[in-house]
Structure formats: C-alpha cells, structure tokens
Amino acid sequence: MDALTGTSNFDICEYIILQLIDEYRDTNTVISMLCKTSVARNVFKELKRKKVAFRSCDILEFDASKVFGISASACVLLIQLSDKDEVSDICCVYDFEYPEKRKSKFGYINGQFYSHLEGQSDNFNGYCCFEWRQGVKHDCSKIMELSVKDGIFKNGFQESVLIEDTIVYPLIKSSMFKAPIIHNFSKYVIVTQKKIREDTEHLKNDVPKTWEYLSNNEEKFKRRKSSIYHGAPLFSMFGIGEYSYSKYKVGISGFYKKPLFSVLFSDDGKPVMTDDTSYFICFDSYDMAYVAMLLLNSERVQNFLMSIAFLDAKRPYTKKVLERIDFNKIVSVMTIEHLKETEKELNLSEYISEYMYIDFKKSIGMIQLCLT
C-alpha cells in the first residue's frame, strides 16, 4: 500500500547497495558508493535491522548541484564490513572537502533512532497517544479543489462551478500552515466519501448538481495514474475516514524544515480537510486542540523533533516521526508557565488556563488507560 500511495522510499541505488552488503557480509570488505543522503541513512538502518557485522559506516556529503547539477542531497557512503561480531550504533557525517572534521552523527540510543546525537534535548521519545493521520488524496486537483470568487466556486481551470456546498469542505494544503490558529480559508475541496471505497452512487440523488459536475469531468478521473483507483467507485478518494470529519484538528505540513503545528477549525463548524502531504491529530473541543498545539510548538518539543527528523529530507516530518512524540512524557515536565511562554512567542492572545491544562492531562491519561 505504501508503494501504491507514494509513501514508500524505494530507490534502485539502495537496492544495489543492500545486495552488495548481502554478498560480502561477514568479510572485511569496504563498500563505497555515491548515493542520495536519504539512501545512505536507510542503508545504515538496514545494517542494524539485519544485524550485519560492520566496523564503521560514514557519510561524506558534497554539493551535488555543483558536481552533477542536481538539487538532491548526495554523498559518498563508506561502509567497513567485518568478519567479527561487531556493530556500530553511530553513523558519522563529514564534508567531502574537509573529511578530517566530523559535521554531525546520527544513530541509535537504547534501540531508538535519532537524527542528531550531538546537543541536548528532552527525551520525549515514546508512543503518541493520539493517532496521526494524513489528509485526503484525490489526484484530480483541477476538478476537486475549488476557490471562491464573488461568492461563486471556481475550479482549477477558473471555470464557475455551480454545485451544492453539502460535500464541499475547507481545505488546508501543506503550504498554508503559516499560523498557529487557522480558521479562514481560500481553498475548498469536494469530498465524495466518508470512508475508503464507499459507494458514491448515492451522490446522484443527494447532491445532483455536484454529481453532474463530477460526471462531466469523469474522463479526468479516469486518467489518474495511481493503481489505487482501479476498481474503486466513481470519483473515489483516499486518506478519508471518520477522523476526517473531526471538528478540531492540530495539523502540520510534512515539508517545512521548522515545524509549525496549527489548530484547524471553521467558524461554521464544518470539518477542515488537509491534503495528503499534511498530518493531523483530532480533538472534540477547541480547548484540547489548543493545549496540544501549544505543547507541540513549545521550544522543548521542537528541539526534540529536531533530534529525530532529518531536515534535508523531502518530507522531514512524517507519520513515523510524529508518532514518536509521547504526550505523557511532555506533560510530566511541562508546566502551565511553559505554555503561557509559548503562547506569547506565537503572538497569541492570552487564552490558556490552568483548568484547560489539567483537563488535557486527564484526557490523555484516559486515552493511555484505553491503550493499555
């Protein structure tokens, strides 16, 4: 499914390197390969996962734009395999032009992976009591995504779209996460289903104008390349479920280097959707979402996130990264004063209260009980 939805990180170079490692494991062979930095990191993880004996694993980064004219982050990966029962928990990173001085290091501490092992951050690593979700995926933005001009919906072709607003929802795309609280919208999206592979025929009667609009553009839906749509009901979407219709969400763009978590809600109570390059957790009340947003944007949590994410990755903040945030550990050390400080740093009006924070702690305590 990861391969179908585009979330897998398969790379042919990675496959070749892993084949070489399998071929020469348990020998003193040195393997050196040019590859993307993300591939090098994945190879290091595979060395550990497969319990391959190796003396060292180093990365020598260079400017790929100067050498090859490409924008990818690239390196020379240098692996010293071993015929002895030895393994390193650390991968060191150097500059190719100045290899005598280490730039950084990453690796494992107590079985947990960290992107930066130098510098101090709180240990908020664990399991997130809230489930991080991705937004909707439709691969037909010109038709499904709308803007409003003079009170009329316009699609991506700037055509007027005269449809019911019943299944039209506010949309926040990854590039729109620019404020800690978002409740004004310039984009909207047609959401055709409540859950994956739900039949859509009922829309013909429920929202006839919308059905007619979609039907008039059926050929564009048929041209969607991803095989996930093959055999699915007409105008199907993915990344959709009951969670999509939560009134309050705390979301983040997967692309930003510096993470900003935003409370998402609409003034009319209509659920806010995000695109599939964004991630969010759901809440039943604004107050609980607000507390979570402050915690996640606090300096201590931000520093922790920097220690487990690779900022040169195309998408630094993935579900795998976010689900390591342990709210129980966070609230055990963060005080109301910390939240007030974060509120001030975000230029928000004073809103957080001791009562709200206590209520939030009780809430995640109940969630934790349900999970155990």
Kindly label every feature range from the protein language model:
Residues 38-42, 55, 81, 218, ...:
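A generic secondary-structure signal for well-formed alpha-helical elements
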Residues 61-63, 351-354:
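Polymerase palm active-site segment centered on the conserved acidic dipeptide of motif C
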Residues 1-152:
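Signature of N6-adenine DNA methyltransferases within the class I
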Residues 121-341, 345, 355-370:
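Polybasic, glycine- and aromatic-enriched phosphate-binding surface used to engage nucleic acids
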